[in-house]
């Protein structure tokens, strides 16, 4: 279970994962060794799974975001999810309830790129149908959830 200090450390790292232990310690008024030990413990327990950066995907050529619902044969769902998850354009693969069995969020350079992806998904054994939504405007896209 996370205590208040762990939550504060995580909150700071979520805003800037490059911040030094010394800066975190100063901000929270604790010893640098405490910060080091807490972060190490959070990594070892799997709470922190790595340090990354936040990209502006449009600035690197991925101008199109799509959300795809996939209806699949029950016994093939896991295999389909694994195949789709390997594609570098795929941001998220969710096993869900409702009309569709799988929801995929992916980024593409253009409509042709998306079209090839959709056709590729439709060719996977066990995929019955897809429903693809093109995102017109990203209002919020932030997968960071502070504890």
From Swiss-Prot:
Keyword Secreted carried by entry: no
Any one GO biological process: response to amino acid
The UniProt record lists the keyword Transmembrane: no
InterPro entries referenced in this protein's UniProt entry, alphabetically: ArsR-like_HTH (IPR011991), AsnC-type_HTH_dom (IPR000485), Dimeric_a/b-barrel (IPR011008), Tscrpt_reg_AsnC-like (IPR019888), Tscrpt_reg_AsnC/Lrp_C (IPR019887), WH-like_DNA-bd_sf (IPR036388), WH_DNA-bd_sf (IPR036390)
Gene3D superfamilies attached to this UniProt entry: 3.30.70.920, Winged helix-like DNA-binding domain superfamily/Winged helix DNA-binding domain
CDD domains associated with the record: HTH_ARSR
Alphabetized GO MF terms: sequence-specific DNA binding
PANTHER family tied to this protein: LEUCINE-RESPONSIVE REGULATORY PROTEIN (PTHR30154), TRANSCRIPTIONAL REGULATOR AZLB (PTHR30154:SF34)
Protein name, entry field: Uncharacterized HTH-type transcriptional regulator PYRAB04820
Gene source species: Pyrococcus abyssi (strain GE5 / Orsay)
């Amino acid at each position: 279970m996370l205590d208040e200090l762990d939550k504060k450390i995580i909150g700071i790292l979520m805003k800037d994962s490059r911040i030094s232990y010394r800066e975190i310690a100063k901000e929270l008024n604790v010893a640098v060794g405490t910060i080091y030990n807490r972060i190490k413990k959070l990594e070892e327990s799997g709470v922190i799974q790595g340090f990354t950066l936040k990209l502006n995907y449009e600035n690197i050529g991925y101008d199109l975001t799509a959300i795809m619902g996939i209806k699949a044969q029950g016994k093939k769902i896991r295999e389909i999810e694994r195949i789709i998850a390997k594609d570098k354009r795929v941001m998220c693969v969710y096993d869900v309830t409702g009309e569709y069995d799988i929801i995929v969020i992916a980024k593409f350079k253009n409509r042709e790129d998306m079209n090839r992806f959709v056709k590729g998904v439709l060719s996977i054994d066990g995929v019955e149908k897809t429903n693809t939504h093109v995102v017109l405007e990203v209002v919020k896209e932030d997968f960071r959830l502070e504890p």
